Curated annotation (Swiss-Prot):
Residues 413-477, 483-549 form the SAM domain. The keyword Hydrolase applies. GO terms for biological process: cell differentiation; innate immune response; NAD catabolic process; negative regulation of MyD88-independent toll-like receptor signaling pathway; nervous system development; protein localization to mitochondrion; regulation of dendrite morphogenesis; response to axon injury. This is NAD(+) hydrolase SARM1. Autoinhibited: in the inactive state, the enzymatic TIR domain is held apart by the autoinhibiting ARM repeats. NAD(+)-binding to ARM repeats maintains an inactive state by promoting interaction between ARM repeats and the TIR domain, thereby facilitating inhibition of the enzymatic TIR domain. Following activation, possibly by nicotinamide mononucleotide (NMN), auto-inhibitory interactions are released, allowing self-association of the TIR domains and subsequent activation of the NAD(+) hydrolase (NADase) activity. Self-association of TIR domains is facilitated by the octamer of SAM domains. Phosphorylation at Ser-549 by JNK kinases (MAPK8, MAPK9 and /or MAPK10) enhance the NAD(+) hydrolase (NADase) activity. Phosphorylation at Ser-549 and subsequent activation takes place in response to oxidative stress conditions and inhibits mitochondrial respiration. The modification Phosphoserine is found at residues 549, 559. Homooctamer; forms an octameric ring via SAM domains. Interacts with TICAM1/TRIF and thereby interferes with TICAM1/TRIF function. Interacts with MAPK10/JNK3 and SDC2 (via cytoplasmic domain). The gene is SARM1.
Amino acid sequence: MVLTILFSAYKLCRFFAMSSPRPGAERLAVPGPDGGGGAGPWWTAGGRGPREVSPGVGAEVQGALERALPELQQALSALKQAGGGRAVGAGLAEVFQLVEEAWLLPAMGREVAQGLCDAIRLEGGLDLLLRLLQAPELETRVQAARLLEQILVAENRRDRVARIGLGVILNLAKEREPVELARSVAGILEHMFKHSEETCQRLVAAGGLDAVLYWCRRTDPALLRHCALALANCAMHGGQAAQRRMVEKRAAEWLFPLAFSKEDELLRLHACLAVAVLATNKEVEREVERSGTLALVEPLVASLDPGRFARCLVDASDTSQGRGPDDLQRLVPLLDSSRMEAQCIGAFYLCAEAVIMHIKNRNKVFSDIGAIQSLKRLVSYSTNGTTSALAKRALRLLGEEVPRPILPCVASWKEAEVQTWLQQIGFSQYCESFREQQVDGDLLLRLTEEELQTDLGMKSGITRKRFFRELTELKTFANYATCDRSNLADWLGSLDPRFRQYTYGLVSCGLDRSLLHRVSEQQLLEDCGIRLGVHRVRILTAAREMLHSPLPCTGSKPSGDVPDVFISYRRNSGSQLASLLKVHLQLHGFSVFIDVEKLEAGKFEDKLIQSIMSARNFVLVLSAGALDKCMQDHDCKDWVHKEIVTALSCGKNIVPVIDGFEWPEPHTLPEDMQAVLTFNGIKWSHEYQEATIEKIIRFLQGRSSRDSSAGSDTSLEGAAPMGPT
C-alpha cells in the first residue's frame, strides 16, 4: 500500500512538472503506436508479474525493479530485432526513457537505476550499443551515445566499455561534430575518465583529452559542462602522469573560459574543481598558477550558496542522488591540501553533498571516507573565511560537533589557549600536567619529545606520536608574522608545505633568510631541532641556491605583471569571447590582463588604469550592446568608456574584435571616445577561431589596426571601420 502511494505521488509530481515546457523534456517522449506519447512511466503500470531481483535490496527498490525490469527486457528485445533506422531510434528512445526516469526517482533513484543498468549489461545491451555507435546513420550514433552516457555506472564501465569499447568511443570523439553527438561523447568521456588511472592515461594518450579541450571553445552549455566534469575527473582519477599531460596540453588555460562563464554556475564550479585539483600537484603547480584560472576559484565559491548548488544537482538526472562514496573520497585530499583554492572548492563540494546526504539520510558516508576530521581541521586552522564557513556548515548538516577556530598566532598563546587546543585534539587528560608546567604558546612550539615524556608525563610512545602529529599540523598552519620579519615561513612553505613547521625553531635562534645559507647541517639539528636529515639537506641546498636568484619577496616587479595585451569587454555579453581570446593569445605566447573580479575595493580603478598604461595592446571586445552604456555617459563613469579613453590617450594599439555588434552613429558616443570608430575591426568567427586569432596576432605584432590596408584583407573575419563621415 505504501509503495503504491509513493509511486502515485511521484507520478502526480511528474505530471505537474511536465505540464510546462522544460529544456530537454521532449527527448524523453517515446512514440506510441498512434504517434503520441507512451502509456506513462513504468512504475505506474500494473498487472506485471514479479521478476526476481537481488535479495539484498530494500522493499521499495525491489518493488520498483519488479515493475521496470519486464518492460526494460521487452524494450531491449524489440531493439535487438529492429530492422530499420526508425525502429532502432524508437527502441533506443524507449530504453533511454526507462533509465532516465529511474534516475529521477526520489530517494531510491540510484539503486533502481543501478539495477536497470546492470540488467542492460546482462542482456547484452552494452555490446549492442557499441555496435550502434559505429552505425552509418548519424541519428543512430547520436541516440546510442546518449543512452550509453546514461548507463555508464561503475560495473558497466569496467565490464565491457573499458575492455573493448574505448576504440569506438575515441573514433566518435574524432568526429568533433555535430554538437548533439559531441555532447554525449563528452559525457561518455566524463564517465570513462573515472574508471581507473590506466584507462584515464589511455584516453589521454589516444586523443580523448584532445577532443575535450577542443570542445572547450564551443558555446553549448551542456557540452561545456561535460567538458568541465571530464577534465575534473581526469585530474582526480588519472594520477600525476595524466595531470602532467593535461598541463602540457594547456588544460589549465582552456579551463579559464569555462570557469569565467557568466551564465552557468555548475559549469564554473566544475571547471574550478578541475584547476584546483591540478594545482595540488607540486610538479605542475607553477604552470597552473600562470594560467590565471586558479584566481577565479575563491571569488566564485565565496559568491555561491552550497544549498542552492545542491538543489541544482538534485534536479539534474545524472547527479540527483549525489556522488557515490568513491567520488566523495576523491574530494577529501583537497581539504588536506596546502592550497587555499583546493581547500575552498573541496569544502564547497562536500558541503553541497552534505545537503544532499542529509536529505537522503546517508550521513554515515562522510565518516566512512574520513572527511569529518579534515573538515574539523579546516574549521580549526583555515584563515580563509569562506573555507572555514563552508566546513562549519557541512559539519552541522552532518550532526557533528563544530570545533572553535584556533588563534593563528600560536607563539603569543597564553596557557588558556594551550588548554583549549589540547581539548580540541583529544588530549584533555594532559591538561592538568600542562597547566602545572605553565606551558604557553612559546613553550609549546619548542616542546621536545624528552620533555613531553619526562616533564609532562606522556609515557606511551604511540600517544606521543599522535601528539606530535597534531603539533606538527599546528606549526604548519600557524602565523609567524610577529616574529618572522624576513617571511621565512612562506619561503619554507614554497619548498614543501611541511617545512613551515620549522619556522619557529629557526627564528628563535635569530636566523632569517639572509643568514640561512651560512648555517651548518649540525646547527640545524642541534640548535633548530630539525631532526630529519633529508629535510636539513633540502633546506640548506635551497638556501644556497637562493644566493644566485632574487628573493620572491623583494620589491622588484616581476615581468609577468606587465601584460602584452589588455582585454576590455562588456560583462553581460562579452565574457565568453573575452575569455576565449585570453586563452588563444596565451597559447601564442602573449601575456594577457583580464579583470577577474578579484581586485580589492577602492583599488579597482587604479589597477585597471595601470594595466592599460603598461600594456602595449588594447583588445576591445565589441559584443552585442557593448557601447550602449557609453552613450550619454558624458561624466565617464562607465568602465568600458574609461578603459577606451585611457587606451586612446595613451596611444595604445587598439584592436576591436566584433561579435554580434552593430556600429553606432559617431555622434551618439561621447566625443572623447569617438576615435575608437576609426579602427579596423576583426569579425570573430566561432567556427574558424584559429583563422581569426591569426589575424588578431598580426595586428598585435606591429600592424596597426588603424592601417587602412589592414581592412582590405579578403578574409571572412575582416570588418570595415565606421569612422565619421
